[in-house]
Regions:
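His/Glu-rich zincin catalytic helix
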Residues: 1-48, 156-202
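Acidic/histidine-enriched segments that form metal/cofactor-coordinating
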Residues: 44-158, 179
Length: 202
């Protein structure tokens, strides 16, 4: 079996940061990191990369936490095809007014499900009591109200800030020749230029 996970250090706590291109402080609504994760699978040609990976027989998924977002799959066959798809969709976001508005309804339903989950509500309320101002208390998905303010420009700004190899970690586990798999990954990287550290404000 082979396993790969590609994670970016961008989670629900990263809702205030400095735009490296303008030097201005950027404040984003709660739930943007999770929203961005949902939208990454949709490609410009209408294809959903998650379905492409599943059609190859791969067990693929993605998730968002307080401090990172990750895209992953595991398989016994078709690893190279899966690697192509993973590195393609993570490096080629496609956001439009239409597909962002559509996603708000989908995530809104997901938020509603968690609102009805007593265990999750217990956790969120405990975090709210433990942390007065720290963004770790924020629900990863945000709220219906906060995600209503998300737009394509905001998603692209966050993508361009946080989805860069210098802020990401790619881990591969399995029967690989280290030099060979590293070469294959480097061939697929679009932008590998070094960047300065991201200035986050908490």
């Amino acid at each position: 079996k082979k396993y790969i996970i590609w994670a970016t250090k961008f989670g629900s706590i990263d809702n205030t940061f400095i735009d490296s291109t303008t030097g201005e402080k950027v404040v984003i609504p709660d739930g943007v990191a999770h929203f961005l994760e949902h939208k990454m699978f949709e490609q410009k040609n209408g294809v959903d990369s998650l379905y492409v990976l599943m059609a190859l027989g791969l067990d693929a998924n993605a998730y968002t936490t307080n401090d990172h977002t990750a895209y992953l799959f595991e398989c016994t066959d078709h690893f190279d095809e899966g690697l192509d798809e993973l590195m393609d969709y993570v490096q080629n976001p496609y956001f439009t007014d239409q597909n962002v508005e559509k996603e708000k309804g989908i995530i809104g339903q997901e938020i509603g499900m968690y609102d009805d989950d007593p265990g999750w509500q217990l956790y969120i309320n405990a975090m709210d009591c433990l942390y007065e101002k720290n963004p770790i208390k924020v629900d990863t998905a945000g709220t219906v109200e906060t995600i209503s303010g998300i737009n394509p420009e905001m998603l692209y700004k966050c993508y361009n800030t946080f989805y860069h190899p210098s802020n990401m970690v790619l881990t591969v586990v399995g029967d690989f020749e280290p030099e060979a798999i590293l070469a294959e990954i480097k061939k697929r990287l679009k932008d590998n230029e070094a960047r300065g550290e991201i200035t986050r404000i908490y």
